[in-house]
Amino acid sequence: MLGKDMKMEEQNAEYVQEFLDNEIVRLGELIEEYKANVKVMGEDFNMDNPNGGMYSGMELTQIHHEMEKQFIYSEEAARDAYFYKKLRKAPYFARVDFKSDRATREKTIYIGLRTLQKHDTFEMLVCDWRAPIASLFYEDFPDKAFFKAPSGEIRGDLLLKRQYKFENGKLKYYVDSDLKIDDDILRDVLSSSSSEHLKVIVNSIQREQNKVIRYSDNENLLVIGPAGSGKTSVGFHRLAYLLYQNRTELSSAEIIMFSNNDIFSSYVADIIPELGEMPINYSSFYNIFKAEIPTISTGDYYSLAESIINGDSRRSKSAGIKLSKDFVAYLESDTDVCEPEFQDITLFGNVIFSKEALLERFLSDTENSQKSRGARLAAYTQGVIDEYFINNREEIYLHIDADSEIDEDTAKLFKAKRRQIKESAAEMIKSAILVDPIAVYFKLLEKYAEENNCPELLDTMATLEKGYLEFEDAIGVVYVKSVLGMAAVLSGVKHILIDEAQDLSYIQHKLILRMFPRARVTLLADTNQAIISELNTTSKEELAEIYNANILNLNKSYRSTKEINSYALKLLPEEKRYEIFERTGEDVKEISGNIEDFKNVVKEMAENSPSTCIITRNLKETIEVFNELKTEIDGLRICDNKSFELSHNPIVMPLALTKGLEFDNVIVYDKDGAFSGDENKKYLYMAATRALHRLTIFNCKSELKSEN
């Protein structure tokens, strides 16, 4: 859309592009200068250099530190240059004209991914989307506009809200909007193809999403939203916003994102750097297992999900108990099932403190962890030893040197003996309380199973003999280790983002709180997408209670076309349905046929768009489909929870691994009604909402066989 101001807008775009070009050149020269400096200093630092011996050790240390600084400056300049090159494609995406009630003239603010400011004149060319004044673009104001600045609320008149479309650095058009981000531009954004990585959405953030992003960093936040509502993107944009707002208090290294799906972690890994920040940390509970119980192999969340999806009701019941709130309380209340084996503290054949008395005192102290109780017992024991030495001084002197009078040397030996007894007692107590958390966990499990008549809880004990722990047992072991005070406490982590929070069990959430006691938490959840709802904390009220979190709702889905969204909504109970953004596309296809028909459908869809995913109910079916199609479909890949990177090649995946991902085209492989029936509607809903543009449900009657 061309307007009367198009010439002026083109001139402004060229002005900003010129600034970027100059900055890229300047940064390139700086990088070369830093490299040259490092080279010169490196020659001086080389001791083989004839002049190397001229420097003292302190001077060489200073040279080394200066070289490190030059390396850091060079890396920072390189990052800035890289980012400026990206900004050349679209230096900004919006403009607002605002007249504050305090000002006499209006102010024009261009908004982009990053602040662009001239070094000499301090002229602000582009304002960072995270700046307080930029919030004017994302909000709707029926009356006076306002934004929250550090100095307080600034009120005034919003005179213009304008959006821009750039293509390869050239301004194509702009659109003026009175109230909200223009739907045509939003449709344009949503109509684009899927990507191997989560996309930056700063140019299309909606009002309710903006509220989540800019929410207070002093409180825990639970974000509830349907599939396609932008929860994950909003969560990461919130992290970028918090980093921008708290430069001196929060760094990327102090943030961690938790997910049950390692493939999803790779999908989102680039978004924080794309938003101009250093990468954050990513983890899963499987990584925690490797750190806390490294001597034993463990299952992951996906292996448990596969068992439940495949109908293993016995394991479902067992895991449901092990991951529950009641079992957590049981683990916390009785970790003394493996009593410490204390030894008598003796001196010259006399018992100072008996092992029975040590155990009795230890068991009578029920506050805090076993490690803390052991420390208190050790401190108490030191006092008992001191008192014994004072009360039995003469007898001890006789044992030390019966033939000599008490002199200075004897007194020194007396003190040395007391120190020796105290040190050995402290070491004995420390060793005694270092119980095996695996042994403690399984003793507790046996006790609980007997008390509650749940023999199925012990089914997984057989795997321990093979050096393997199932996921639900590994979580329990690490939790017991934490209760005992033996697990890591990562106080340096200040913020945690938990994606698909509804897929984490009660015990997982509680373990996060124990291991990261200083961290604020942002949780992203959709209770309609609990992959194994029998095991998980699916109530948003319960999630909020665990973290003492406030709840914000995202009520509209943007990902899929109107046709796909309408199909998915019919799979949900009426009370759980949500708003959709209307973007029209192709009708959803429901096809029945044999294996040859299935091959033809996949071929046709993959030829039209490589971003095609065939979603199966489980891993067994994934392998069957892949083996049947691998010679028919060019570049077909299989995702089976091993090392995997997403690409634009067609792919076959089991349902559990598709959580959080999106594809242009989705074919749901409904083998013999695997996704049919009321009990399977939630699985079909999860699969259907992975599709952006085209969705096909294929009911295949032919029997496929997996190859080993």
Where are the language model's segments positioned?
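Conserved phosphate/pyrophosphate-binding and hydrolysis machinery centered on Walker-type P-loop NTPases
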Residues: 191, 195, 367, 371-374, ...
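A structural signal for short, well-ordered beta-strand segments and their strand-loop junctions
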Residues: 95-97, 163, 222, 234, ...
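Conserved helicase motor core of SF1/SF2 NTP-dependent helicases
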Residues: 248, 262, 266, 270, ...
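Short, conserved glycine- and acidic-residue-centered signature motifs
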Residues: 235, 470, 680
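Extended, charged low-complexity regulatory segments
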Residues: 1-202, 206, 210-214, 708
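Alpha-helical nucleic-acid-binding subdomain
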Residues: 243-497, 503-511, 519, 528, ...
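Short hydrophobic beta-strand that contains or immediately precedes a catalytic carboxylate
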Residues: 205, 497-498
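P-loop NTPase Walker
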Residues: 2-34, 188-304, 686-689, 708
